[in-house]
Regions:
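Hydrophobic alpha-helical membrane-association signature
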Residues: 8-12, 109
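Short alpha-helical interface patches
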Residues: 7-8, 46-47, 122
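Short, residue-level hotspots on alpha-helical faces of the histone-fold
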Residues: 18, 115-116
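Active-site oxyanion-binding pockets that recognize sulfate/phosphate
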Residues: 2, 24, 103
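Small-molecule kinase domains that catalyze NTP-dependent phosphoryl transfer to phosphate-bearing small molecules
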Residues: 56-112, 118-126
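ATP-dependent NMP and nucleoside kinases share a basic, alpha-helical "lid"
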Residues: 11, 16-74, 81
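Flexible beta-alpha connector loops of hexameric P-loop NTPases
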Residues: 1-9
Length: 126
């Protein structure tokens, strides 16, 4: 449900904040289907430490990559509240970085993310 999704993202953000407060770089990858949910995460983590990376994949691309058959189950009604099928998905309006996975390989996508994120990480002086 929508409330379950919000709670899941809230918990992830709270744990991330604990790691960040300990000086640990934290990368999270999860489905956050609404702008509201992403704002909740950003508010918990803090704008300074929150970098939104939009991994952009069309429904068609997701279905082609779906080895578990979840999209098929969602389309048949076996799975309800499935993002992009029976529940909304709102694309980010202004992500820090967008990766179009239909055009980029896994290696190219990974490089693009790392090239963006690594320069923002401040390592403590030893």
């Amino acid at each position: 449900s929508s409330e379950d999704r919000k709670e899941n993202i809230r918990r992830i953000a709270e744990v991330s904040k604990l790691f960040i407060n300990c000086g640990i770089v934290t990368l999270n990858c999860f489905i956050s289907p609404t702008i509201e949910i992403r704002e909740i995460a950003k508010n918990i983590i803090g704008k300074k430490n929150f970098i939104e990376v939009y991994i952009n994949a069309t429904i068609k691309t997701c279905e082609q990559r779906d080895v578990k058959g979840l999209y098929k189950k969602a389309r048949s009604g076996e799975i309800t509240h499935f993002s992009g099928i029976s529940a909304p998905f709102e694309a980010p309006k202004n992500p820090a970085l967008e990766i179009n996975t239909a055009k980029l390989s896994i290696d190219e996508s990974t490089k693009k993310v790392l090239d963006y994120i690594l320069p923002t990480i401040k390592m403590p002086s030893i």
